[in-house]
Regions:
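P-loop NTP-binding catalytic core
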Residues: 58-62, 66-133
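N-terminal accessory targeting/assembly segments
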Residues: 1-84
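Glycine-rich phosphate-binding P-loop
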Residues: 133-144
Length: 144
């Protein structure tokens, strides 16, 4: 069972990992298919029986704290952020208004991306900017 990650989802109780798997990066929930856990190396394992469409809908409602309209801006971007920095990508039919996505309907899948620390990922950047006595740096860029 996924309990150490403290995902605020009742559906997490259905997810089981039968073999050791460290560094889980994603949990993919898809209607009519088993959920899949993916670790930071890209290894995938089936970790539940298939989720029904109603279980996916219930999970989505729970992710939105049963107030989907409160998360409309995030949903329009295709994801919802959970406490702890975890993000849930939404797969469904986009509803557009004036060429802009407003929301999703017929949600068929959720991709839970587990927030995790990557130690040392900025060591080179840090030494490059701060070795000469620079005291502040602003780094801006388009999200990947």
């Amino acid at each position: 069972m996924i309990s150490t990650m403290k995902l605020p989802l009742k559906s997490a109780a259905k997810i089981r990992i039968t073999e050791p798997m460290s560094g889980i990066a994603e949990i993919r929930l898809r209607a009519g298919r088993p959920s899949v856990c993916v670790n930071i190396l890209g290894d995938m394992r089936i970790c539940s029986d298939p989720f029904s469409a109603s279980e996916i809908a219930d999970c989505f409602a729970e992710i939105c704290r049963y107030s989907v309209h409160s998360f409309q801006e995030e949903i329009a971007q295709g994801f919802v952020t959970l406490d702890g920095g975890h993000r849930v990508g939404i797969c469904g039919t986009a509803v557009k208004n004036g060429g802009k996505i407003e929301m999703f309907k017929d949600i068929s899948g959720l991709n839970i991306r587990i927030a995790h620390e990557i130690k040392g990922c900025a060591d080179e950047v840090y030494s490059r900017f701060f070795s000469g006595g620079t005291r502040s740096v602003l780094i801006a860029g388009k999200p990947l």
